[in-house]
């Protein structure tokens, strides 16, 4: 007998064949009309939120963050140069879209720290992520030995320093020592060490 969390996970793995697909399509319509960062009462994917550390208690909130899809382009340079040196179109950013979503959620709630985030959907224009935020000064968080580490000053602004899971991936880390020797402790610091 599958647990309820397993059933939720399986339905998200095969979304187009599952029963929640019509509901998800309706969600996309309403999500596009809503704001870019919206606080939620409960997570859309309960299994994923719980596996990433979410608890339904005081000090924890869930925020849905919306980020545009695709590459970026910078404003066109009006000074003279060869066309091939313009480089204002088809730019790939070093940050992942998920990390950008986490940073925008952290900007909206400056008194909270980002714990983690997970994917909840996309349409033709946007990708949607739900971000787990923790109030670092909440008594319920400080008394919980599993999450009280986030109240340390070393973890302040962790999303901006690439210390979340999405940040680790963007920095070329997160898959052990093998293959990331030149990315540690960071790409910039490693380059300085090799001079």
From Swiss-Prot:
Residues 174-195 are annotated as: Disordered. One of its GO terms (biological process) is cytoplasmic translation. It holds the Pfam family Ribosomal_L15e. Keywords: Ribonucleoprotein, Ribosomal protein. It comes from the Archaea. InterPro entries: Rbsml_eL15_core_dom_sf, Ribosomal_eL15, Ribosomal_eL15_arc, Ribosomal_eL15_CS, Ribosomal_uL23/eL15/eS24_sf. One of its GO terms (molecular function) is structural constituent of ribosome. HAMAP family: Ribosomal_eL15. Belongs to the eukaryotic ribosomal protein eL15 family. This is Large ribosomal subunit protein eL15. It comes from Picrophilus torridus (strain ATCC 700027 / DSM 9790 / JCM 10055 / NBRC 100828 / KAW 2/3). The gene is rpl15e.
């Amino acid at each position: 007998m599958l647990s309820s969390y397993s059933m939720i996970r399986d339905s998200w793995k095969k979304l187009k064949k599952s029963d929640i697909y019509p509901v998800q399509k309706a969600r996309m319509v309403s999500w596009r009309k809503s704001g870019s960062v919206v606080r939620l009462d409960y997570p859309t994917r309960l299994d994923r939120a719980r596996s990433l550390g979410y608890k339904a208690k005081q000090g924890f909130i869930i925020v849905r963050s919306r980020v545009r899809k695709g590459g970026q382009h910078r404003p066109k340079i009006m000074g003279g140069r060869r066309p091939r040196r313009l480089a204002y179109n088809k730019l790939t950013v070093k940050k992942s879209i998920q990390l950008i979503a986490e940073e925008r959620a952290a900007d909206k709630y400056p008194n909270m720290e980002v714990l983690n985030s997970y994917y909840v959907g996309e349409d033709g224009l946007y990708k949607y992520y739900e971000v787990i935020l923790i109030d670092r000064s909440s008594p319920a968080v400080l008394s919980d030995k599993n999450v009280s580490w986030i109240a340390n000053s070393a973890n302040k602004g962790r999303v901006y320093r690439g210390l979340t899971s999405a940040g680790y991936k963007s920095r070329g880390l997160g898959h052990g020592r093998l293959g990331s020797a030149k990315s540690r402790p960071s790409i910039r610091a490693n380059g300085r060490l090799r001079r």
